[in-house]
Amino acid sequence: MSRRDGSGGRASAGRTGKPDQKGKLLDMSATPPLLEIKDLHVSAEDGAILRGVDLIVGAGEVHALMGPNGAGKSTLAGALLGHPAYTVTQGSISLNGEDVTAWATDVRAKAGLFLAFQYPEAIEGVSVTQFLRQAMAARKGTEVSVLEVRVLMTEWMERLGMDSSFASRHLNQGFSGGEKKRNEILQMALLEPLVAVLDETDSGLDIDALRVVGRGVAAVRAERPALGVLAITHYERLLTELVPDVVHVLVSGRVVASGGPEVAAQIESSGYEAWR
C-alpha cells in the first residue's frame, strides 16, 4: 500500500540509522535531511507547473520520482538547481538544513547539489579532463592538480566501462546517449555532492548501458554511503539497479503518493490511472 505522504514516511524513519559499508550505523537522527522540499510551487512562462511539492531525502537514501509526461518532473529538477526558466512562487528548498531557494545555481552546486541532466550540453574545445578539473576546483574551493584529476578519472572510467581516450575528448561532443550518461555519473563520482538528482538518466539507454550506469551509481554510494539520491524516471528498469528506499508519484505538479518499490511495479503494470 502506498503512502499519501509526499515527504516519504519510510525515509524519515531511515534517518535514525543506516549501516555504512563496514556495518556501522551512521547517526542521522541529530542532523537535518540532506534535501527538503516544502510546499514548492513553480511557474514558467506557460503558467504554474508544480503545485505544492513536499519531499524529503535523508542521508544515504535513494528516492525515485516517477510520473507521466507533463507531470513536472524535469521542472522540479531544474527548479532544484535554480534554472532561470523557472520561478519559485511559494515554498522552499533546503540543502543540509540551509534554505537555498534564493541561491544562484553555481552556489547550490558548490554547496553540494548535483544534477545529472537529461540532455547534457556539448562544449566544443573543452576536454572532459579540463571540465572536471575546473568543476572539482569550484566544488572544493581550491586548486586541483592535473595528476589528481587523471588518477581519479582513470579509476572511475574503468568502473563505468569508459575507454581511456574519453578523457581527452571534448565535453559531450559527438557522444552517444550512453556516453553522455556515463559522463554524468563520472562527474558525480569526482565532485562528491551531498545530493545527486538524476534527471531521467535512463533515457535512451539500452539494457547493458543502463546496468553500467546503475552499478556506477551504486559504486559511488559504496564509496560515500551518506550520499542522497533523487532519481527521476519514467521506467521501473532503472530502479531494479538503484533499489530505491522510497518511490514518489508526481501527477499534475503534486506528489500524490509515496511508498516502496511496489509503487514502481504498480506503475509498470497499470500506468498512472490510479492517481489521475
Model region roles, listed by residue range:
Residues V246, L250, R254-R276:
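Conserved beta-strand-loop-alpha-helix hinge in the C-terminal portion
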Residues V197-T201, D208:
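Walker B catalytic motif
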Residues M188-A189:
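ABC ATPase C-loop
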Residues M66-P68:
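The feature captures the beta-strand-to-loop junction immediately N-terminal to the Walker
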Residues L35-I37, I49-G52:
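Conserved structural motif at the start of ABC-family nucleotide-binding domains
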Residues S92-R108, N172:
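ABC ATPase NBD Q-loop/coupling interface
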Residues A44, V53, V57-A59:
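Conserved hydrophobic segment flanking the Walker A/P-loop of ABC-type ATPase nucleotide-binding domains
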Residues L115, Y119, G125-K140, L152:
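Q-loop/switch helix immediately C-terminal to the Walker
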